[in-house]
Amino acid sequence: MMSEEVRLRPWRRALQTLLVLLLAGGCSRIPRIIVLEDPLTAAEHVELGVAYERKGELDLAQREYGRALRKDAKFYRARVNLGNIFLAKKEYGKARKEYLLALELRPGDADASNNLSWAAIFSGEGIGEALTRMESVVSGPNGRQPTLLDTLGVLRMRANHPGEAEEAFALADALCRQAGAASKEGVSAAAPCPEEVLREIEEHRGELRRRFPSASPAPAD
């Protein structure tokens, strides 16, 4: 006997279709009804998206973050992660949109503000707005973090404020090294500053020296 799949949602429509087919005169085929439901929660879709993202499968990660947002449009982490996917794909306008939506959910949030700043840096658009936002984030509670200060330094450099950019980079470098030293001595339970963050800070300071040689710090005696 032949069968065919009729994928309908919700289940009431599927049942109605089945009754119509069964009552139709001369119908000898009984279709198999499959009612598709999404068993995953929004949080589970985000977890799946993160797993895909770590494997470099950005399209699949984007799909899962989109599914999470269809279930919960106010899911902050899904918004930021989706913005990160667009940023990685160099779709800066779309990334900016997602970060702004995330900031509507959490005004002044450091992560969303930081990533929105990088959308501005990479695209070259909205540097002034991003700089104002990051100045506010860094001056707020818990704002003195190496990664945030590094981003602030890059924004200042792009806005042609080399002296202020060097101040941000120098403070980011100092805090990063202090965290590493404290962790080694067992003084702090916080994780040490990753080496990649130190490398990024030094790379950005190198870019600053190339762009603005006069902004280079004076050599130590």
Language-model-derived ranges and their functions:
Residues 46, 53, 80, 87-88, ...:
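Position-specific recognition of the canonical hydrophobic site in helix A of tetratricopeptide repeat
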Residues 88, 100-147:
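Alpha-helical adaptor scaffolds
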Residues 37, 71, 105, 139-141, ...:
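Structural marker of alpha-solenoid helical repeat scaffolds
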Residues 35, 42-43, 76-77, 110-111, ...:
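Helix-start (N-cap) detector for alpha-helical repeat units in TPR-like alpha-solenoids
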